[in-house]
Design a protein with these regions (language model features):
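Bacterial N-terminal signal peptides that target proteins for export
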Residues: 1-12
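Bacterial N-terminal signal peptides
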Residues: 10-20
Length: 310
């Protein structure tokens, strides 16, 4: 092999490596946000199983996001950290040429109002690398504002989006390593307040008070989405089932506010409801629970994608 040929190979290799690096840095990391920006519905499941086998199964499931429920499962940060590492698909990273996870991990924390507890729990799950938080039982605008602030770092003095002032303590080493980026602090802000942000602060509306206050809640700067909890909502309204017409009316009230303000809205679904919910305007939905995709969840995922044209 001649000297010129060797130099050509080195030059081409350098160009390819540079292209991969640029692609990885420019690529949107949070797939759910990318789908929102492209007006495409997203599909996920609830996860209560922190095992490595389930992590691998979920990472290759074909879903868009994983709703890791730490409200109704143990709040165990070390198990969460190992679970996230288990979802890392190195082959996919190489094949795609970017660092975006195929399935975005999001966490619902247990705290439902206590400020100190909420801030601490949000900080801990963010510090291991999740891409967003579901905050349960949000009834008021003040709760939503606190949730957004707990998700953000304090901004630099010249930041155009300084408010709502962040409360998250800064020690991003684990999250930075998991995301695979050096500019974690710059990218770990809430979307859509920061258009380049990769974090989602999402509020669960699951009470009569939450429905009544939805217009105030939904206009909080930094709010990234609304998730309607039909079961708790029906209980809050005094009904034994989400099928009650009054509960569905409340669901449509929240959805209508989301559509009016262009805020992504989510709800739990199954085979019998996923197509209807997508047609109604829900932007992201869960289609079942984890442990691998069972037949019902797989069918719901298929029907949802067909309804969404994906």
């Amino acid at each position: 092999m001649g000297k010129v040929t060797k130099n050509m190979i080195l030059m081409v290799s350098s160009i390819l490596l540079l292209s991969l690096t640029v692609s990885a840095s420019a690529q949107r990391l949070n797939k759910l946000i990318e789908l929102f920006e492209n007006d495409q519905p997203a599909f996920g499941v609830l996860s209560f199983d922190y095992s490595l086998n389930n992590a691998r199964a979920m990472a290759s499931s074909g879903l868009d996001f994983l709703f890791i429920d730490m409200e109704h499962a143990p709040f165990d940060i070390e198990r969460l950290r190992l679970f996230l590492l288990g979802m890392t698909d190195k082959r996919s990273i190489i094949e795609k040429g970017n660092l975006q996870p195929n399935v975005v991990p999001l966490v619902r924390i247990p705290a439902a109002g206590g400020a100190e507890e909420l801030i601490a729990q949000a900080k801990q799950v963010l510090d291991v690398g999740v891409f967003g938080i579901f905050f349960p039982a949000v009834h008021t605008r003040e709760q939503a504002e606190l949730a957004v602030r707990a998700t953000r770092y304090p901004q630099y003095n010249d930041a155009p989006d300084y408010e709502p002032a962040g409360l998250r303590g800064r020690n991003p080493s684990n999250a930075m390593w998991y995301w695979g980026v050096r500019d974690y602090h710059a990218r770990a802000d809430v979307w859509p307040l920061d258009p380049q942000g990769e974090l989602l602060a999402m509020m669960f509306i699951e009470s009569r008070a939450g429905v009544e206050n939805i217009e105030e809640i939904i206009t909080v700067p930094g709010l990234g989405g609304i998730f309607i909890g039909p079961s708790d909502l029906s209980t809050s309204m005094g009904y034994t089932s989400p099928a009650a017409p009054e509960v569905e009316q409340a669901i449509q009230t929240v959805l209508g506010a989301c559509l009016e303000h262009d805020v992504p809205c989510a709800i739990t679904t199954g085979q019998g409801s996923v197509q209807q919910r997508i047609d109604q305007g829900f932007r992201f939905v869960t289609v079942g629970a984890d442990g691998g995709l069972n037949t019902g969840a797989s069918n719901a995922l298929r029907l949802g994608r067909e309804a969404a044209g994906r």
